[in-house]
Amino acid sequence: MNNLIVFGSPLIADRVPRKKFDELILFEKKEKYAERLRQLLPNAKVRNEDVNSPGFKAMAKARLEAGSVHFLAFVDPEGLEIEWETLQHLFDFTGDLIINYQSTGVSRSALKENKTSAEIETLQRFFGTDEWKACGNEDALFKLYLEKIRKHREVTIPIKVRSPYRFHYYMIVAVRKTRGSQRWVSVIEETKEKIEAIKPEDLENIIRRLSGGQVKLAV
């Protein structure tokens, strides 16, 4: 399965939607990855910059402050990279977010004994509070994070994704509540049920099938 190519979030955002986004703005702090994104998505605006930087906040304010621009932000950090202050900045504008919360990694860092001062500071920035210190397990940490998001977006739907490699993460869909029916929120709820019903071994079989290693899925 080493040669299997799987689309990441930027490519999915560009290739999958029937109705294309008006604009794609991508932040990637690693230069080699930013350059690769430019090659794969020549029409996207790729910025080789840390999303927690003042540059991101200035860009977001300039582009979104008027309130006439609706956006979907897909927040796909590595570990504890995304700071709560950055999310808070996005919540202040008119838009929806999908946030990848890496539950296993977060709990491993937060529940670790004898943390360094740098590790504690990273956790403080990630949660935006010291309340994480009172959390004794993985579920409590996730609940804290989820409740902080719900203070800014009434419609917040966590989707648990279980990996075949013995870890899991959550895709948190956080959207504004509007006066309309928001039929697509029901679609997200239905999708949540389907994704959470998938067993880790099913995912492994899917990967093998895509890579040509298995003829059919186990039932």
What are these model-predicted stretches?
Residues 55-67, 88:
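Short amphipathic alpha-helix with an adjacent loop that forms part of the alpha/beta core around
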Residues 1-59:
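SAM cofactor-binding core of SAM-dependent methyltransferases
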Residues 22-23, 70, 96:
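Residues at the starts of beta-strands that form the adenosine-phosphate
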Residues 79-92:
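A short, conserved alpha-helix within the catalytic core of class I
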Residues 69-81:
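A short SAM/SAH-binding and catalytic strip from SAM-dependent methyltransferases
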Residues 94-108:
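Conserved beta-strand signature within the Rossmann-like core of class I S-adenosyl-L-methionine
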Residues 178-210:
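Flexible, glycine-/basic-rich loop-and-beta segments that form/coincide
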Residues 109-175:
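A conserved mid-domain beta-alpha-beta active-site/ligand-binding segment of alpha/beta enzyme cores
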